[in-house]
Each structure stands twice: as structure tokens, then as C-alpha cells.
């Protein structure tokens, strides 16, 4: 019988109470890295959207993103602003790599989402609008 592979690092914990603002930000959202720069294939963060706020239009480069709605009722807008996917607590949503989108909180309470991405650390590329240039470039 061949030996079982050994883990490359110990089990890690990121307590919710210890998360601080970090990583890529977009206007209207608070992003807090939870488990980043620990392994090449995945990272995790928390996103908090205050009531009546929305992010800039953005994408996450080559990273696929899975959203788990933890609290509040939020929306992912995509396809040039024409498609809306509403998330309530317990719902999952896949945002494919390079997909332009916007997070929206039209409600009266915070929206909190757990975010898992297919990379070592979250990548956030803010745009000037749907189909727009990378924000801040050439300005």
C-alpha cells in the first residue's frame, strides 16, 4: 500500500470577528479577506454591502467566483445591466471569470456574502461602466 499524501500546511481558521477591510475594493462595498495567500487554488473573503448601495461595475479577471448569501437580500447584476439575480440567505451564485457584474443592495439592512475565488488572493478589476475601460487607466 502506498503512503497517503501529507498536507502541505495545517488547518487554518479565520474568525468573523477578526476580519478587517482588505484586498480589492469597489465603491459601495466593504471587502474583508478571510483566507488568502494560503494556497494557489482558492481564497475566501466576506463582502458587506450597506443599505441602498451598489458596487462599481467590475470583474475578477481569470478567477471564477462563488457567492454564498449569509444575510440580507442582495442582487448580482450582469449582462450589461440587463440580468438581475436576487440572492437571499442560503443561496449560492456562480460568477464566471471575466464576467462583468455589479453587486446591489436595494434593501434597508446590510447584505453579507461569503466569497470564494479560484485564486491565491482576490482580484478585483473596476471598470468605468458596462463594457468600459479599467477604471483609473489613461485618466
Report the location of each language-model feature.
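Short, well-structured hydrophobic secondary-structure segments
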Residues: 47-55
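A short, sequence-level motif marking secondary-structure junctions
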Residues: 17-20, 62, 90-92
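A short beta-strand-loop-beta hairpin characteristic of the jelly-roll/cupin
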Residues: 54, 60-89, 99
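Double-stranded beta-helix
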Residues: 2-4, 102-139
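Conserved hydrophobic/aromatic beta-strand scaffold that supports enzyme active sites
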Residues: 44-48, 66, 84, 92-94, ...
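Conserved metal-binding segment of the jelly-roll/cupin
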Residues: 78-80, 87-107, 116-118
Amino acid at each position: 500500500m502506498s503512503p497517503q499524501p501529507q498536507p502541505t500546511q495545517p488547518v487554518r481558521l479565520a474568525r468573523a470577528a477578526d476580519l478587517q477591510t482588505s484586498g480589492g475594493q469597489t465603491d459601495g462595498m466593504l471587502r474583508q479577506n478571510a483566507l488568502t495567500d494560503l494556497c494557489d487554488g482558492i481564497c475566501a473573503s466576506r463582502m458587506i454591502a450597506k443599505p441602498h448601495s451598489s458596487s462599481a461595475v467590475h470583474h475578477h479577471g481569470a478567477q471564477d467566483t462563488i457567492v454564498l448569501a449569509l444575510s440580507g437580500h442582495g442582487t448580482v447584476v450582469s449582462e450589461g445591466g440587463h440580468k438581475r439575480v436576487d440572492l437571499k440567505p442560503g443561496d449560492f451564485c456562480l460568477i464566471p471569470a471575466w464576467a462583468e457584474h455589479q453587486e446591489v443592495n436595494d434593501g434597508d439592512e446590510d447584505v453579507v456574502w461569503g466569497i470564494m475565488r479560484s485564486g491565491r488572493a482576490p482580484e478585483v478589476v473596476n471598470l468605468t461602466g458596462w463594457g468600459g475601460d479599467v477604471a483609473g487607466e489613461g485618466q
